């Protein structure tokens, strides 16, 4: 199974331990909106929480041992939706960084 698919499945299954095993200890998510670096533990707790955005659909565009690209449609509690493109940097079988770009989808 691909690293990205495992990450997607672990998030869908709300499995925090398995989710964190896919990410390196020094992993961070570079937020597209602010440039802030969000560390693994902070991101994973949010994504597995009841306040997390819901993934409507996902697809892996490309993945090899060094990089992966995936596209998601997500929805938020307030009813807003986004199309999100994520680039994952992979090293030694773990994701070490991800960066996102998002487009708001009109209601």
Could you describe each region identified by the protein language model?
Residues 4-9:
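Amphipathic alpha-helical repeat scaffolds
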């Amino acid at each position: 199974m691909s690293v990205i698919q495992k990450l997607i499945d672990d998030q869908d299954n709300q499995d925090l331990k398995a989710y964190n095993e896919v990410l390196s200890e020094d992993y961070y998510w570079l937020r597209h909106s602010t440039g802030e670096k969000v560390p693994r533990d902070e991101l994973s707790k949010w994504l597995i929480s009841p306040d997390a955005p819901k993934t409507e659909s996902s697809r892996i565009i490309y993945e090899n041992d060094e990089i992966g690209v995936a596209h998601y449609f997500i929805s938020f509690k307030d009813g807003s939706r986004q199309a999100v493109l994520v680039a994952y940097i992979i090293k030694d079988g773990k994701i070490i960084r991800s960066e996102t770009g998002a487009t708001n989808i009109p209601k």
